[in-house]
Amino acid sequence: MDIKVDHISKAYGEQQVLQDLSCVFPEGKTTCIRGRSGCGKTTLIRLLLRLDVPDKGKIEGISDRKFSAVFQEDRLCENLSAASNIRLVCTETITDRELEEAYIAVALTEVWQKPVRELSGGMRRRVSILRALLAESDCVIMDEPLRGLDEKTRAKTIDYILKKTEGKTLIFVTHEEKEAVWLRADRTVDILTKY
């Protein structure tokens, strides 16, 4: 089932963040959400994940979904290793070989046994990405997931994201044109207005 956003609006106090936004996220397809900083991309993500509710309008097709997500701020267990953080969300059927392939794909092979608190910001982002990709979900939402990664690692990571989300609904937020091109999205939602 497609996810349908129907004339939603959202304000925080006097600050209007989204106004009368409508869009569709097709089932099993990749959608890129683009827009400048502060235009409401993250607010839309919070509404899709049911972490907040719109002031007006409605969102259909989210109530029975299994979501996994990469947030702008990572939500990792500081004292656990990168591997343990990833295994927390994996099904028991995931193999060591699949995990090894994942570490290689996003260049984490040297640090997967280290506690997350010892990792750089870019490494932490990649741990968050693997958690979202390897969790049991049918819709993956990523809010600026490649922020802080160098260009070579970004390109390699996007290839792995596309491989692991094939057949799933992927909603990918970026403000960088290059990432939007690399993503080869089936659909693009541009949020143009900053209130």
Name each model-derived stretch.
Residues L49:
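Helix-to-loop junction immediately C-terminal to a conserved catalytic motif
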Residues N79-E98:
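Q-loop/switch helix immediately C-terminal to the Walker
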Residues I94-V111:
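Conserved ABC ATPase "signature" region
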Residues P115-M123:
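Conserved ABC ATPase signature
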Residues I129:
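Hydrophobic anchor residue at the start of the ABC signature
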Residues L134-D138:
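A short, proline-enriched helix->beta-strand linker immediately N-terminal to the Walker B motif
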Residues D143, D150:
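ABC-family nucleotide-binding domains
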